[in-house]
A protein has these predicted regions:
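Helix-turn-helix DNA-binding elements, focusing on the entry/boundary residues of the two helices
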Residues: 18, 29, 47
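Recognition helix of helix-turn-helix/homeodomain-like DNA-binding domains
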Residues: 27-42
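A short, Lys/Arg-rich alpha-helix, primarily the initiator
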Residues: 1-17
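Key DNA-contacting residues within the recognition helix of helix-turn-helix
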Residues: 33, 62-63
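DNA major-groove recognition helix of helix-turn-helix/homeodomain DNA-binding modules
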Residues: 45-61
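Short alpha-helical "recognition helix" segments of helix-turn-helix
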Residues: 20-22
Length: 69
């Protein structure tokens, strides 16, 4: 389950628009929004791509954002 609040903070800090991030992931803006809101799950490849784009380098931060309980 994605920690929506933490992910939204990282997106805002990155300066990227959600439409740009969605395009980089091969998703529509709507598809990305559904994943951020936990309506659908991120694929491992999407998580890895977002980590690169959003400069999420620590495994702890990655886990806190994408594998929240």
């Amino acid at each position: 389950m994605t920690n929506t609040e933490l992910l939204n903070e990282k997106i805002e800090m990155s300066g990227y628009k959600r439409s740009y991030l969605a395009k980089q992931l091969g998703l529509s803006a709507y598809g990305l929004a559904k994943k951020i809101q936990n309506e659908t799950e991120f694929k491992a490849s999407e998580i890895n791509a977002l980590c690169v784009l959003l400069n999420i380098v620590s495994p702890e931060e990655k886990e806190a954002i994408f594998f929240a309980m």
